[in-house]
UniProtKB/Swiss-Prot annotation:
UniProt protein name: Anhydro-N-acetylmuramic acid kinase
Its job: Catalyzes the specific phosphorylation of 1,6-anhydro-N-acetylmuramic acid (anhMurNAc) with the simultaneous cleavage of the 1,6-anhydro ring, generating MurNAc-6-P. Is required for the utilization of anhMurNAc either imported from the medium or derived from its own cell wall murein, and thus plays a role in cell wall recycling.
Pathway(s) of this molecule: Amino-sugar metabolism; 1,6-anhydro-N-acetylmuramate degradation; Cell wall biogenesis; peptidoglycan recycling
Membrane-spanning residues: none
PANTHER family with a match to the protein in the record: ANHYDRO-N-ACETYLMURAMIC ACID KINASE
Signal peptide: none
Protein family (similarity comment): Belongs to the anhydro-N-acetylmuramic acid kinase family.
CDD domains noted in UniProt: ASKHA_NBD_ANMK
HAMAP family for the chain: AnhMurNAc_kinase (MF_01270)
Organism expressing this protein natively: Shewanella sediminis (strain HAW-EB3)
A GO term for molecular function: ATP binding
């Protein structure tokens, strides 16, 4: 009986659902044994979106959502195991990212906050949980993000071939794997799907722009594009990370206020170009050519992929499927891997990426007993 399974739980800034993966690490290449996506109920999603912005009675809302999200994460694990026909006794630990509700690493007392009570997950599943992966890195002077570049390096690096792994979730982040002994570079480029999702939700009450079809029907307004790309984040040096605290619907409405004459589809096209141009600028600053593999929800946006391809003529553009891991499961597997690293007493961060003063074992253990 295999007892070397780890589970990864991930809910990103898009908050489009909880990804749960069961991974076998008994061989050098991880094997994805089972996968499950759990929808976040609408009332919980509304409260999470509310909590991501400053408001009243935040502590009460935070406490209740911490438990609610923990229960959802626990249910996702139980559903995953039922699907796979695997008993809880075969799982070493769950690596839970949690749901980020605030990420502000650049304050004098920088912090990041993920909810989804790991004690609740442990009790609901009967499996030890490793969680709170980001705050050790922040305690060491780092950004606490992105953390997945260490996993990207382990799984996707290729000698003598520069590669970029680009994750496009709510926020987009890239990992530059130089193919040499040089340091891996990784950082958040800026908005991924967060602005295009916010705009289509506001105008059409749709969760996302499928295939980027609405953006494709519009024409980018160069003046608005230039205005949005003038945000100071885009010119900051790395290491850097961001989130919905900077790029959200309120910011979008404020920035677009003087552009009310624009067609709604033209605004969507412009927002998609904010994502594509910010990614392309940072990519070209690292290397003019190479291989670029996309993961995350953005990999399924055909208009986004097409525009990126045009902006990066020196790159061979594809998805992480070509490297053996489907785009939607990369981050979940990464947190299963981080749980395994914690279990083995191994570091999980890359100081060159996060800015931390040293490598460290990430996460805390929450026993099921």
């Amino acid at each position: 009986m295999n007892t070397n399974y780890f589970i990864g739980l991930m809910s990103g800034t898009s908050m489009d659902g909880i990804d749960a993966v069961l991974v076998d690490f008994s061989s050098p290449s991880p094997k994805l044994v089972a996968k499950h996506s759990q929808v976040i109920p609408k009332h919980t999603l509304r409260n999470l979106q509310r909590l991501c912005l400053p408001g009243s009675d935040e502590i009460n809302l935070l406490g209740q959502l911490d438990r609610s999200v923990g229960l959802l994460f626990g249910a996702a694990v139980n559903e995953l195991l039922a699907k796979a026909g695997i008993s809880k006794e075969q799982v070493v630990a769950i690596g839970s990212h949690g749901q980020t509700v605030r990420h502000m690493p650049n304050l004098d007392m920088g912090f990041t906050l993920q909810i989804g009570d790991p004690n609740t997950i442990a009790i609901e599943t009967g499996i030890n949980v490793i969680a709170d992966f980001r705050r050790k890195d922040i305690a060491l002077g780092g950004q606490g993000a992105p953390l997945v570049p260490a996993f990207h390096q382990q799984m996707f690096a290729s000698p003598d071939t520069p590669r970029i792994i680009l994750n496009i979730g709510g926020i987009a982040n890239l990992t530059y794997l130089p193919g040499t002994n040089d340091d891996v570079i990784g950082f958040d480029t800026g908005p991924g799907n967060t602005l295009i999702d916010a705009w289509i939700q506001q105008v059409k009450d749709q969760a996302y722009d499928e295939d980027g079809a609405w953006a494709a029907s519009g024409t980018t307004d160069e003046k608005l594009l230039k205005h949005l790309l003038s945000h100071t984040y885009f010119s900051q040096p790395f290491p850097k990370s961001t989130g919905r605290e900077l790029f959200n619907q309120a910011w979008l409405e404020q920035q677009a206020a003087e552009f009310g004459y624009l067609n709604e589809a033209d605004i969507q096209s412009t927002l998609l170009d904010v994502t594509c141009h910010s990614i392309a600028k940072d990519t070209l600053a690292l290397s003019l050519r190479g291989e670029l593999f996309v993961c995350g929800g953005g990999a399924f946006n055909t208009e986004l992929m097409s525009r990126l391809d045009k902006l990066l003529p020196g790159y061979k553009l594809s998805t992480t499927s070509d490297l053996g891991i489907a785009p939607q499961w990369v981050e979940g597997i990464a947190f299963a891997w981080l749980a395994m690293r914690h279990h083995q007493g191994l570091s999980g961060n890359l100081p060159a990426v996060t800015g931390a003063s040293r490598e460290a074992v990430l996460g805390s253990l929450f026993p099921a007993d």
